[in-house]
Curated annotation (Swiss-Prot):
Heme b b562 binds at H83, H182. SUPFAM superfamilies: a domain/subunit of cytochrome bc1 complex (Ubiquinol-cytochrome c reductase), Transmembrane di-heme cytochromes. Keywords: Electron transport, Heme, Iron, Membrane, Metal-binding, Mitochondrion, Mitochondrion inner membrane, Respiratory chain, Transmembrane, Transmembrane helix, Transport, Ubiquinone. The gene is MT-CYB. GO terms for biological process: mitochondrial electron transport, ubiquinol to cytochrome c. This is Cytochrome b. It comes from Chiroderma villosum (Hairy big-eyed bat). Component of the ubiquinol-cytochrome c reductase complex (complex III or cytochrome b-c1 complex) that is part of the mitochondrial respiratory chain. The b-c1 complex mediates electron transfer from ubiquinol to cytochrome c. Contributes to the generation of a proton gradient across the mitochondrial membrane that is then used for ATP synthesis. Binds 2 heme b groups non-covalently. The chain crosses the membrane at residues 33-53, 77-98, 113-133, 178-198, 226-246, 288-308, 320-340, 347-367. It is found in: Mitochondrion inner membrane. InterPro entries: Cyt_b/b6_C, Cyt_b/b6_C_sf, Cyt_b/b6_N, Cytb/b6-like_sf, Cytochrome_b, Cytochrome_b_C_euk/bac, Cytochrome_b_N_euk/bac, Di-haem_cyt_TM.
Length: 379
């Protein structure tokens, strides 16, 4: 008798995606982050759903409703901190996932890569809107500064900002619509994840060597299911340790002060996972130029497949490109650090240097190094 998982209309889709899926035998732990992101999304949707049951999206009560969740709701503090730190874990996995794609040349699957970039933008938008909801001091001013950047768009900028705000400043209308979109977007993200997986399963997975692995495939279950479960355990242990021992480690103390439009914090900054882009934005003195650089810092990923000049797909056997890749990682860490510092000497010049290096490495140095490596290998 044929197994039901291979004949049932629904089960055979799950079977071909997670059980009998042929996978390269050489996948390292860097391929775990896709499934970890799935777990992060599930955790965020579940904790967010329960938080939404007690949260009120009104400027007068939003801050107090979050306090009520933490103090009066059963395990409300756990839900709140799992959701807040789960977002940080989400972005850690997301950046490692993108980094792995850059290192091993996964971007040559252009459809999967482009849907991934859309996902990155959608998750960033979701995180930004969720960031505003507790209505703390830094949340409020962060929302004001970031949304105000849209006023740099010529001709329609000011109208666009007021349209998003629902008035002449970040107020009740803004909070209500941000809550509505923050609730909706994760489900759009989940749908995009399905499209991402659909395109991935059309081509099959890349592998660390970057060479076709068709002759050497193994079934996804049990080999990679066990490997993924180990990844889940490690990530959930790290998340639990963060939530139960230092839940405010990655947050800002100003957010324990209710939002006050009459009192500006000395240094406005977003959450740590946006600091690299924020540093690039601040490093350009012109407002429109800064906004364009901010968008390009993420959108530049879309032209990485076009800039791939190497005859080899992966960086595994390209030591010069490896050096540049790790220099890029160092530049990103530097930008993240600078984004959290005040706008003064020497941070301004360090930020500008790191921003120039970021674009220079991706647009010029990496393609040039790839061409040189081809020449050295006489290809």
């Amino acid at each position: 008798m044929t197994n039901i998982r291979k004949t049932h209309p629904l089960l055979k889709i799950i079977n071909s995606s997670f059980v009998d899926l042929p996978a390269p035998s050489s996948l390292s732990s860097w391929w775990n982050f896709g499934s970890l992101l799935g777990v992060c999304l599930a955790v965020q949707i579940l904790t967010g759903l329960f938080l939404a049951m007690h949260y009120t999206s009104d400027t007068a009560t939003a801050f107090n409703s979050v306090t009520h969740i933490c103090r009066d709701v059963n395990y409300g503090w756990l839900l709140r901190y799992l959701h807040a730190n789960g977002a940080s874990m989400f972005f850690i996995c997301l950046y490692l996932h993108v980094g792995r794609g850059l290192y091993y040349g996964s971007y040559t699957y252009s459809e999967t890569w482009n849907v991934g970039i859309l996902l990155l933008f959608a998750v960033m938008a979701t995180a930004f809107m969720g960031y505003v909801l507790p209505w703390g001091q830094m949340y409020f001013w962060g929302a004001t500064v970031i949304t105000n950047l849209l006023s740099a768009i010529p001709y329609i900028g000011t109208d666009l900002v007021q349209w998003i705000w629902g008035g002449f400043s970040v107020d009740k209308a803004t909070l209500t619509r941000f809550f509505a979109f923050h609730f909706l977007l994760p489900f759009i993200v989940a749908a995009l994840v399905m499209v991402h997986l659909l395109f991935l399963h059309e081509t099959g997975s890349n592998n660390p060597t970057g060479i076709p692995s068709d002759p050497d495939m193994i079934p996804f279950h049990p080999y990679y299911t066990i490997k993924d479960i180990l990844g889940f355990l490690i990530m959930l242990t790290a998340l639990s340790a963060l939530v139960l021992s230092s839940p405010d480690l990655l947050g800002d103390p100003d957010n324990y002060i209710p939002a006050n439009p009459l009192n500006t914090p000395p240094h406005i900054k977003p959450e740590w996972y946006f600091l690299f882009a924020y540093a690039i934005l601040r490093s350009i003195p012109n407002k429109l130029g800064g906004v364009l650089a901010l968008v390009m810092s993420i959108l530049i990923l879309a032209i990485v497949p076009i800039l791939h000049m190497s005859k080899q797909r992966s960086m595994m056997f390209r030591p010069l490109s490896q050096c540049l890749f790790w220099l890029l990682v160092a530049v990103l860490f530097t930008l993240t650090w600078i984004g959290g510092q005040p706008v003064e000497h020497p941070y301004i010049i360090i930020g500008q240097t790191a921003s120039v290096l970021y674009f220079l490495i991706i647009l010029v140095l990496m393609p040039a190094t790839s061409i040189m490596e081809n020449y050295l290998l006489k290809w």
